[in-house]
Amino acid sequence: MNRNLTVAMTAALMMTGTVSQAQEVNIGRSNITLKSDLMTPEALWAMGRIGSAQASPDGKKIVYQVGYYSVKENRGHQVLRIMDADGKNDKLLTTSAKSESDVAWLDNQTLAFLTDGQLWTMSTDGSNRHQLTHSDIAIEGFRFSPDKKRVVLVKSIPYHGTIKENPDDLPKATGMLITDMNYRHWDHYVTSNAHPFVANVTANGVDVGKDILEGEPYESPMAPFGGIE
């Protein structure tokens, strides 16, 4: 692993100590008894939904993301799990009520992931958690360079090229002034664009980074199907 990344992880542990967790219900795997062979809404919501999965560099482990949902709480919870490549020794890594996602291998012993809009790392047993970023804008995706000296961070920045901002004297107005096409993506209006930021990995963590599409009206990755790839 890159030396700066190792130093940053150690420094983060010394500075943060124990991270306080929000007092929220920790939604996990549901135990449901099927009384018939009918597929019911309750049965569907009780099922975990597997997201991304990645094999370790040596091919011995697989880490993957699972989404669990609670009808009572009216929300979901994304968790990370790890298992041997043969499917044995499956283990839950996420212990917080906050979601953890977008997991990736840094080496055979270290994982990087997102939680609460920030980039973190941890060991493959779930210990040694370190926060690498302190971004004012939530991080939505990331990809480390092969030498681990730089990382691409995906952040959404405000964009009003097609939907104009509300006038200062009408800040709570719900009407919209649309002046161009591409003002909506499927289920949401385009008031922000995803931009890739190239950041350096230093001994103090990961810096803010440089927006390589600064001032441009484009988005990368592109909604709704674009990803960090």
For the regions a language model picked out, list residue spans one by one:
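Multi-bladed beta-propeller domains
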Residues: 26-49, 73-75, 81-99, 122-138, ...
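Bacterial N-terminal signal peptides that target proteins for export
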Residues: 1-8
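Predominantly five- to eight-bladed beta-propeller fold
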Residues: 24-26, 78, 156-202, 214
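Boundary at the C-terminal end of the N-terminal hydrophobic targeting segment
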Residues: 20-22
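Conserved beta-propeller blade repeats
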Residues: 47-62, 95-112, 129, 136-154, ...
